[in-house]
Swiss-Prot record:
It comes from Pongo abelii. The keyword NADP does not apply. There is a cross-link at residue 21 (Glycyl lysine isopeptide (Lys-Gly) (interchain with G-Cter in SUMO2)). The lineage of its organism: Eukaryota, Metazoa, Chordata, Craniata, Vertebrata. One of its GO terms (molecular function) is L-malate dehydrogenase (NAD+) activity. The modification N-acetylalanine is found at residue 2. This is D-3-phosphoglycerate dehydrogenase. There is a cross-link at residue 21 (Glycyl lysine isopeptide (Lys-Gly) (interchain with G-Cter in SUMO1)). Keywords: Acetylation, Amino-acid biosynthesis, Isopeptide bond, NAD, Oxidoreductase, Phosphoprotein, Serine biosynthesis, Ubl conjugation. The modification Phosphoserine is found at residue 14. The active site is at residues 236, 265, 283. The modification N6-acetyllysine is found at residues 21, 58. PANTHER family: D-3-PHOSPHOGLYCERATE DEHYDROGENASE (PTHR42938:SF22), FORMATE DEHYDROGENASE 1 (PTHR42938).
Length: 533
């Protein structure tokens, strides 16, 4: 299994001691060094397969490309914007996070910010420390009956909603992924963004920082908001346009803002932080003892479980690899890679469209995780840029000029009609289609271009296969082929044939090693190829 050779892990940011202990108890070597420069980080990674960071370490493309052994980057926290995901994916490096670790701490901070905004608690505290008694200046507003708009209804947004509902707030929200039915189950009515702005007394954001969410609150959206709206951002700097927020505060369109995050941290410009109606913190969303312990524990457990082949969770850039650890899906991943390898050997260097077709109830949603494995088989000996694996397969296949499509068929691929679950790989517009299935935990080849094998042909990583197609049985054919093997010093380990199809038969020989050339074979066969995956 991929990443099973992970042996040494660098922890480059401050983490709870439980992280190191769990890693060591799991059999991993651990090095802890913090406040490293880019050059020092690269030097430390030269003999490390794993890296665990919080938010301080910047895992840039330069770091990733220079770390020859690096296989996995773990972020002890939710956001991974300090990791260059594209560079990591291109190099086949797995990136994980701990999406649950700091959810409660971030949600509680958000709720505290909302309450502080409503009652101006930090400003009143500062006034008291300054020796003043200004009761009239700090007139607040009740939360009961007010409308809270929650943008992003994942783990943190959900926890915020539940807590603020207990204070009598009405919660509305928006999330392009969470369904309205799911959000309704925790008391949030979903609305289009243009309907949310004018309804909200308070707005809190809980989305990742993406091109689509950068500047989500801007001059245009502030203009659509209720006058005196209050805004909270404990998610990522940049989701709220800081210039637009300052202008809204200065005009009174926004009555107050609570910010735990900034576009630049620490912020060089002081206009927002110094504004009298702004509450700010130095990115404290995950800064609780419980969150730090939980994040350190979770990322360490994820590393150990991955190395032991037990499970893979928190994956950011390789859904297919997550599925590869499922007992049901794992052999199908192996089958998909085998069929991709077979297709490359059979069709040469295929171009154009590769079709990945699944059949059977349990494979209905498997196409998206099986297609990267097919790509691995297609490209693993052809890719000139990087070692191809389940992490970078979809990225590299486009550069190879291939378009891989997936579909699910209620009937057997190729209308062969055998078995409940099948996987077919075909080259669109060309006479190349291979069909396989899994028997127990063993991937097997069921058919080639409509020619069916009975029994099916086992596909084993330790068994090279020679496949050739001939006219209907010639008594002298088999002795001739065995003689050709002997001349090459190759032993015959197994032999199977397909049912006759269009007057021809496919033959499959398990052999002790791949043949140096197939020219002699092609004199006796319509076509011949060999492969080993």
């Amino acid at each position: 299994m991929a990443f099973a050779n992970l042996r040494k892990v660098l922890i480059s940011d401050s983490l709870d001691p439980c992280c190191r202990k769990i890693l060591q108890d799991g059999g991993l070597q651990v090095v802890e060094k913090q406040n490293l420069s880019k050059e020092e980080l690269i030097a430390e990674l030269q003999d490390c397969e794993g890296l665990i960071v919080r938010s301080a370490t910047k895992v840039t493309a330069d770091v990733i490309n220079a770390a020859e052994k690096l296989q996995v980057v773990g972020r002890a926290g939710t956001g991974v914007d300090n990791v260059d995901l594209e560079a990591a994916t291109r190099k086949g490096i797995l990136v994980m996070n701990t999406p649950n670790g700091n959810s409660l701490s971030a949600a509680e901070l958000t709720c505290g910010m909302i309450m502080c905004l409503a009652r101006q608690i930090p400003q009143a505290t500062a006034s008291m420390k300054d020796g003043k008694w200004e009761r009239k200046k700090f007139m607040g507003t009740e939360l009961n009956g007010k409308t809270l708009g929650i943008l992003g209804l994942g783990r943190i947004g959900r926890e915020v909603a539940i807590r603020m509902q207990s204070l009598g707030m009405k919660t509305i929200g928006y999330d392009p992924i969470i369904s309205p039915e799911v959000s309704a189950s925790f008391g949030v009515q979903q609305l289009p963004l243009e309907e949310i702005w004018p309804l909200c007394d308070f707005i809190t954001v809980h989305t990742p920082l993406l091109p689509s969410t950068t500047g989500l609150l801007n001059d245009n959206t502030f203009a659509q908001c209720k006058k005196g709206v209050r805004v909270v951002n404990c998610a990522r700097g940049g989701i709220v346009d800081e210039g637009a927020l300052l202008r809204a505060l200065q005009s009174g369109q926004c009555a107050g803002a609570a910010l735990d995050v900034f576009t630049e941290e620490p912020p060089r410009g002081r206009a927002l932080v110094d504004h009298e109606n702004v509450i700010s913190c130095p990115h404290l969303g995950a800064s609780t003892k419980e969150a730090q312990s939980r994040c350190g524990e979770e990322i360490a457990v994820q590393f150990v479980d991955m190395v032991k082949g037990k499970s893979l969770t928190g994956v950011v850039n390789a859904q297919a690899l997550t599925s590869a650890f499922s007992p049901h899906t794992k052999p199908w991943i192996g089958l998909a890679e085998a069929l991709g390898t077979l297709m490359r050997a059979w069709a040469g260097s295929p171009k154009g469209a590769i079709q990945v077709i699944t059949q059977g109830t349990s494979l209905k949603n498997a196409g998206n995780c099986l297609s990267p494995a097919v790509i691995v088989g297609l490209l693993k000996e052809a890719s000139k840029q990087a070692d191809v694996n389940l992490v970078n397969a979809k990225l590299l296949v486009k550069e190879a000029g291939l378009n891989v499509t997936t579909s699910h068929s209620p009937a057997a691929p190729g209308e062969q009609g055998f078995g409940e679950c099948l996987l077919a790989v075909a080259l669109a517009g060309a006479p190349y289609q291979a069909v396989g299935l899994v028997q127990g935990t063993t991937p097997v080849l069921q058919g080639l271009n409509g020619a069916v094998f009975r029994p099916e042909v086992p596909l084993r990583r330790d068994l090279p296969l020679l496949l050739f197609r001939t006219q209907t049985s010639d008594p002298a054919m088999l002795p001739t082929m065995i003689g050709l093997l002997a001349e090459a010093g190759v032993r015959l380990l197994s032999y199977q044939t397909s049912l006759v199809s269009d007057g021809e038969t496919w033959h499959v020989m398990g052999i002790s090693s791949l043949l140096p050339s197939l020219e002699a074979w092609k004199q006796h066969a319509t076509e011949a190829f060999q492969f080993h995956f």
